Swiss-Prot record:
GO terms for cellular component: cytoplasm. Keywords: ATP-binding, Cytoplasm, Kinase, Nucleotide-binding, Transferase. It catalyses: CMP + ATP = CDP + ADP; dCMP + ATP = dCDP + ADP. SUPFAM superfamilies: P-loop containing nucleoside triphosphate hydrolases. CDD domains: CMPK. Its main location: cytoplasm. This is Cytidylate kinase. GO terms for molecular function: ATP binding; CMP kinase activity; dCMP kinase activity. The lineage of its organism: Archaea, Methanobacteriati, Methanobacteriota, Stenosarchaea group, Methanomicrobia. It is found in: Cytoplasm.
């Protein structure tokens, strides 16, 4: 079983991926965690690191190539990342999560300990614009085109556990 979980920042991809990985005993490969770790290692915030990635394609290409490689070599995995649904060609289930911008910004502000939601809003918009530009430039992928996903969920009103129940129905259907 190969599952991809994608979505914009703050939509809950990491939380749901961790939940499902634990529940189904699947290995989790997370592009966002790799990206955040690289930013921390360079002593940069995500917006600044995103700007660096715009000028240094090797950052995105390295993360994406690693996810693609793991997905071709392993089974029983969840690959979480903005482009994982496009990069993992042999995925059994491709999921896209979303939520209204204000909801996502609130989650990001909480997660990243940003006290000013206006600052979080600005950073989120900049990050999303930066990512959309890079994905189009590197891969000719329009991140707003969701046609390759099997399941698209708005996460605003559901807890991680409730989202897990919804996705479990899809997993059961794929396994049958």
């Amino acid at each position: 079983m190969r599952i991809t979980i994608s979505g914009p920042p703050g939509s809950g991809t990491t939380s749901l991926s961790k939940h499902l990985a634990a529940e189904h005993n699947l290995k989790l490969i997370s592009a966002g965690e790799v990206f955040r770790q690289l930013a921390r290692e360079k002593g940069m915030d995500l917006a600044a690191f995103g700007e660096l990635a715009e000028n240094d394609p090797s950052i995105d290409l390295m993360i994406d190539a690693r996810q693609k490689q793991i997905a071709t070599e392993q089974d029983d995995i969840i690959v979480e990342g903005r482009l994982s649904g496009r990069m993992v060609e042999q995925a059994d289930l491709r999921i896209w999560l979303n939520a209204p911008l204000t909801c996502r910004v609130g989650r990001i502000a909480f997660r990243d300990s940003v006290t000013c939601e206006e600052e979080a809003m600005t950073l989120t918009r900049e990050r999303e614009a930066s990512e959309a530009k890079r994905y189009m430039m590197y891969y000719q992928i329009d991140i707003s085109d969701l046609s390759s996903y099997h399941l698209v969920l708005n996460t605003e009103r559901w807890s991680v556990g409730q989202l897990g129940l919804i996705v479990n129905c899809a997993i059961a259907a794929v396994r049958d």
